[in-house]
Amino acid sequence: MSSPAPSTQAFSLKTRQPIPDEDALLTEEDRILKQATKGEDCTTRRRACKNCVCGRAELERKLEAEVLTMPPGGCGNCSKGDAFRCAGCPFLGQPAFDATEDGKVKLNLTDDV
């Protein structure tokens, strides 16, 4: 067996190129800060406005109804915790619970002292 032919380098580590000035890369248009206009609409808030006309309120109501009607997961690991739950589990992000409690979380409200 023969050794492979030496490859030619596409770059050299010995030559140093100067670091370009960041300010020289910007144009005058880039330097002008554009002020964002803030309006009173649903896009600036997390929830829909009281008098919502963009359709966000209807979408939120639809999503709430879907979440309430979600069936328990079919993998059987819903009660064990996030490490064991499947990707489509409706209990994802919630703490582990007893499987006989139907997804209700029991909090320990006693003092640790």
Curated annotation (Swiss-Prot):
One GO process term, biological-process aspect: iron-sulfur cluster assembly
Annotated region described as Fe-S binding site B, given as residue ranges: 75-89
UniProt free text on domains: The C-terminal domain binds 2 Fe-S clusters but is otherwise mostly in an intrinsically disordered conformation. The twin Cx2C motifs are involved in the recognition by the mitochondrial MIA40-ERV1 disulfide relay system. The formation of 2 disulfide bonds in the Cx2C motifs through dithiol/disulfide exchange reactions effectively traps the protein in the mitochondrial intermembrane space.
Protein name: Anamorsin homolog
Subunit structure, as described in the record: Monomer.
Chain location of the short sequence motif Cx2C motif 1 per the record: 75-78
Family membership: Belongs to the anamorsin family.
GO molecular function: 2 iron, 2 sulfur cluster binding; 4 iron, 4 sulfur cluster binding; metal ion binding
GO cellular component: mitochondrial intermembrane space
Signal peptide residues on this chain, from the entry's feature table: none
Subcellular location: Cytoplasm; Mitochondrion intermembrane space
UniProt cross-references to Pfam families, sorted A to Z: CIAPIN1
Residues reported in the UniProt entry to bind [2Fe-2S] cluster: 42, 49, 52, 54
Organism: Leishmania major
Coiled coil: none
Renumbered residue ranges of the record's region Disordered: 1-22, 33-113
Keywords: 2Fe-2S, 4Fe-4S, Cytoplasm, Iron, Iron-sulfur, Metal-binding, Mitochondrion
Primary localization: cytoplasm
Region listing for Fe-S binding site A, in residue ranges: 42-54
Residue span of motif Cx2C motif 2: 86-89
Swiss-Prot/TrEMBL cofactor(s): [2Fe-2S] cluster; [4Fe-4S] cluster
Polar residues composition-biased segments: 1-15
Tree of life domain: Eukaryota
Summary of the function given for this chain in its UniProt record: Component of the cytosolic iron-sulfur (Fe-S) protein assembly (CIA) machinery. Required for the maturation of extramitochondrial Fe-S proteins. Part of an electron transfer chain functioning in an early step of cytosolic Fe-S biogenesis, facilitating the de novo assembly of a [4Fe-4S] cluster on the cytosolic Fe-S scaffold complex. Electrons are transferred from NADPH via a FAD- and FMN-containing diflavin oxidoreductase.
Binding site for [4Fe-4S] cluster: 75, 78, 86, 89
